[in-house]
């Protein structure tokens, strides 16, 4: 595949409509017209509200005769109180849709607002483990368009969102099968201005998604194929995107790789995310960075005995040695190459939190799909390793 191939505009439907290619943001007015949208609410995170892509989106919508409000109060780790404020904004502005633009936090925030925008249910009634909420036709979720501006979370196609429960200090997955984006718009131009550290952190998140999803037990050839192709794209293009941030092919490859890995984790995730969710909820750490630090610890715990899985992942990354040790060494080399810190302590997570983080991680839905079950004591040892020396 050539660089030109990667930059060729494409329209896919898998599992939702996806419009991919440089400059596709300019088509957002046409998409709104096709969906019958007149007054969407733009949802983004606090760090993105003053960035050029927000004003550009507003301008393109205005030129197309579409009025739009803006809600930009989503934190890097979205909180339940912010979602409530966003719901009030949606209702008071008589909005008919949500356009979630930004990183994973913005898209998760937009999805969470959608869940309660037209009903009086508590947000936590949509928690993954809860009985599925019955949503009637008169309470149908608003139309949702997702526009990622980072290449990492893969949140743009998902029906799930991660939100911090402020009362419990824990992250939970909220979900409803009827919540599906009507369009994911993937424009690599929107990621060109992403700083090197965020390119690295969000890109490493995509790698974690691909690896964890592929390692989840069970027969799911669709997700497995997407995970391996996503891993191949990320392994090839992430170092390039960090070193040469204006390389459009690298940005495009990363955006597609991230999307594929995000679709793949319909299959599930694992202990990297179980721990990372709780660290992020308590210490507000950047999600992709936290995942990247923890990853080698969990690989050393999970991979022995999984040589059949490791071989295919090694092939995807272009390795000639498909042993478990060689695969872990390559992952660690890539993390070193993009300057990922070697421990959670280096990003300000205190050493005395291991016990309570482990206790919370055991309750995370991602722990239930990890390929190797961890006891409570083992989980605490994993957290301690990530705190002290992950690689």
Where is each model-derived feature located?
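Glycine-rich phosphate/pyrophosphate-binding beta-alpha loops
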Residues: 152, 259-291, 364-369
């Amino acid at each position: 595949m050539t660089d030109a191939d990667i930059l060729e505009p494409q329209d896919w439907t898998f599992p939702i409509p996806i419009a991919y290619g440089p400059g596709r943001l300019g088509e957002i007015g046409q998409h709104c017209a096709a969906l019958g949208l007149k007054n969407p609410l733009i949802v983004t995170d606090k760090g993105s509200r003053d960035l050029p892509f927000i004003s550009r989106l507003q301008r393109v919508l205005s030129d197309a005769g579409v009025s739009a409000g803006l809600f930009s109060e989503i934190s890097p780790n979205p909180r339940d109180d912010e979602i409530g404020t966003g719901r009030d904004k949606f209702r008071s502005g008589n909005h008919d849709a949500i356009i979630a633009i930004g990183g994973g936090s913005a898209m998760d925030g937009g999805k969470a607002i959608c869940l309660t925008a037209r009903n009086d249910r508590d947000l936590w009634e949509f928690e993954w483990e809860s009985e599925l909420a019955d949503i009637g036709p008169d309470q149908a979720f608003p139309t949702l368009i997702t526009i990622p501006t980072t290449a990492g979370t893969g949140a743009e196609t998902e029906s799930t969102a991660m939100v911090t429960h402020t009362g419990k200090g824990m992250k939970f997955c909220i979900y409803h099968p009827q919540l599906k984006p009507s369009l994911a718009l993937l424009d690599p131009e929107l990621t060109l201005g992403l700083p090197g550290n965020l390119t690295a952190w969000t890109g490493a998140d995509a790698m974690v998604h691909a690896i964890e999803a592929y390692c989840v037990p069970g027969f799911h050839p669709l997700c497995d194929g997407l995970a391996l192709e996503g891993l191949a794209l990320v392994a090839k293009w992430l170092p390039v995107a960090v070193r040469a941030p204006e390389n459009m092919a690298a940005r495009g490859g990363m955006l597609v790789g991230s999307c594929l890995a995000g679709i793949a984790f319909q299959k599930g995730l694992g202990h990297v995310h179980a721990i990372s969710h709780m660290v992020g909820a308590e210490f507000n750490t950047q999600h992709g960075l936290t995942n990247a630090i923890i990853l080698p610890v969990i690989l050393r715990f999970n991979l022995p005995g999984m040589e059949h899985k490791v071989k295919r992942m090694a092939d995807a990354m272009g390795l000639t040695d498909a042993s478990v040790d060689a695969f872990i060494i390559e992952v660690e080399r890539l993390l070193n190459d993009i300057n990922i810190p070697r421990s959670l302590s280096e990003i300000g997570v205190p050493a005395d939190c291991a016990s309570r983080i482990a206790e919370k991680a055991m309750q995370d839905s991602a722990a239930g799909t990890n390929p190797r079950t961890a006891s409570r004591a083992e989980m605490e040892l994993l957290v301690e390793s990530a705190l002290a020396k992950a690689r």
